């Protein structure tokens, strides 16, 4: 409907993390409207991981009179830079490949979480229950599966690329600086133009 409203017949689709699952479904259901597909950091979980993530990763949160939701949102964002998954706070799950961003950056992400506080969990739950192993082989459009070297979901790249016919894969550099972001943009542009 969005594409129809904007009078866009077809276009390239990009989806990152949860959005990668959404973009893959658009490509499956409307291949005539998707020129090429880019999946950035698609999560590919085992059944055991899915169950654990559904139970712990994205709890339903509501504002309360003491503002505990504000502290929760800060910790939810901050802890993702320290652990993966963020709810497993052990040395085994510590993310050594990333450094803690400045508080101003964390604050921007927290504000985004707060905008969708009462519904944010629905997108995560949809991604965690997505039947990706069954659905991804149905993608017929040319697809690039990628992730940044510091992305905790990068293990999904190989798994997704194996399932999707007509796919290529690659890894982007660390996105924490402008050079890394520029390289990522160039890699995606080259795929889309190729």
Kindly give the residue locations of the regions a language model identified.
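Hydrophobic, aromatic-rich cap/lid helix
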Residues: 99-132
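Gly/Ala-rich beta-loop-alpha elbow adjacent to hydrolase catalytic centers
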Residues: 15-19, 23
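Catalytic active-site module of serine/aspartate enzymes centered on a nucleophile-bearing elbow/loop
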Residues: 166-194
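Flexible "cap/lid" loop of the alpha/beta hydrolase fold
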Residues: 28, 35-70
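Acidic catalytic loop of the alpha/beta-hydrolase fold
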Residues: 149-154
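Short beta-strand immediately N-terminal to the catalytic nucleophile in serine-hydrolase-like folds
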Residues: 13-15, 40
């Amino acid at each position: 409907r969005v594409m129809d409203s904007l009078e866009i017949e077809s276009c390239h689709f990009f989806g990152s993390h949860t959005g990668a699952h959404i973009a893959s479904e658009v490509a499956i259901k409307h291949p005539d409207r998707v020129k090429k597909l880019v999946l950035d950091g698609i999560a590919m979980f085992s059944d055991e991981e899915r169950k654990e993530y559904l139970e712990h990763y994205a709890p339903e949160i509501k504002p309360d009179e003491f503002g505990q939701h504000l502290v929760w949102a800060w910790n939810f964002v901050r802890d993702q830079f320290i652990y993966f998954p963020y709810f497993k706070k052990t040395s085994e799950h510590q993310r050594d490949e990333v450094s803690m961003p400045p508080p101003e950056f964390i604050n921007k992400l927290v504000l985004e979480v707060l905008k969708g506080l009462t519904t944010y969990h629905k997108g995560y739950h949809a991604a965690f229950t997505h039947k990706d192993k069954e659905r991804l082989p149905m993608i017929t459009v040319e697809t690039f599966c990628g992730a940044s070297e510091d992305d905790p979901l990068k293990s999904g790249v190989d798994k997704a690329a194996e399932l999707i016919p007509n796919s290529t894969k690659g890894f982007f550099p660390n996105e924490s600086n402008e050079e890394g972001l520029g390289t990522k943009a160039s890699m995606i542009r080259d795929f889309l133009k190729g």
